[in-house]
Amino acid sequence: MKRRRPLQLELRSQGRGGSRAGAGRKKARGSGVPHLRRPALAARHPVHVTMKLRAGLPSLRGDRSFPVVRGALKAGRRRLGIRLVHYSVQSNHLHLVVEAADASALGQGIKGLAVRLARRLNALFGTKGAVFPDRFHAHVLRSPSEVRNALGYVVHNFAHHLALDGYVVPRGTRDLLSSAAWLTAPPPETAPVVAAESWLLREGWKRARPNARS
């Protein structure tokens, strides 16, 4: 089956003035994903979003960092056009599974979340500027198997990284810096996530075979 091109959206605002040749900050070597036209996004399709931390900043999984990240996620879990349903916090990136009405709402919602995170993390780190300076990467999930695979990847991502580093990860290990606790149970009001509204995230993914290819 032909692979779908992932959705890649811009976090940064365009700034003042119109489009000008050579205007704006030059692209740094090794910076994030290239800018692509936004494909259509239907509200029934959840999205797996990855946000990469600026190089040189402390780990997001630190004892001081994670509570700040969790607080920002909770504050933005149902604001600015997105609903945060699942997440995992890694040392230098975030994985999110969100619902949004359309591509515009997704872009505005993730941009707002990035601003919220930057404000709080800069205060903690004593730094300035964008904390997630690159365009975020987003993959639209259109089938039960895609959603199941994405959820497994997100909530087990830390175990995946540990295994790549040679550590033995016991089966069933749950990452406490993720939404794994609410994978099959409704989140409480104190959680940094909200209950899913889309059929794919509520019920559809449960009907897919484990490790099924989309």
Per-region residue spans from a language model:
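Short Pro-Cys-Gly-centered "Cys-loop" motif that presents a nucleophilic cysteine in a tight turn
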Residues: 1-47, 51-91, 99-214
